């Protein structure tokens, strides 16, 4: 059975998920942790539960879903995995900070570790996540779907009580 721990992060209340099962393997989805206490809460949760994080998954390349990638890389050696259509966004996270948030950040983001392939499935523990392309919010937006549990991680493709925004492409 999946265990899903949600962390609300940064000034936009972005959702980061640590998804684990009984094997203690876990994946981190959309680590948008900006503030030090958010970063600490996520890493403490993973280490405190003796989890073995094996993937840092990204639904899309907007900064609010990637603020904390450097922390995950430093703590666990994981590089972000993303759709290639969002490569440009991922390589320009500092620019997003300046243009969207009017802030200058000196974060050194880890390089992209893997681009998703068409039809790829992410395996961890006793579970798997299908990668479903859902372009619209960004060209490379994806949804991670666990069919066995009936759970989807949609990033900003869907908002609570609404559809996601599609005007950022």
Segments predicted by a language model, with ranges:
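Conserved beta-strand hairpin/beta-sheet module of binuclear metal-dependent hydrolase folds
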Residues: 1-49, 143-155
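Short Gly/Pro-enriched turn/cap motifs at secondary-structure boundaries
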Residues: 7-8, 111-113, 133-135
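Short, basic and Ser/Thr-rich N-terminal targeting/leader segments
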Residues: 12-13, 109, 125, 138
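Metallo-beta-lactamase
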Residues: 33-34, 96-97, 121, 127-169
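Active-site HxH/HxHxD metal-binding segment of metal-dependent hydrolases
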Residues: 33-39, 43-123
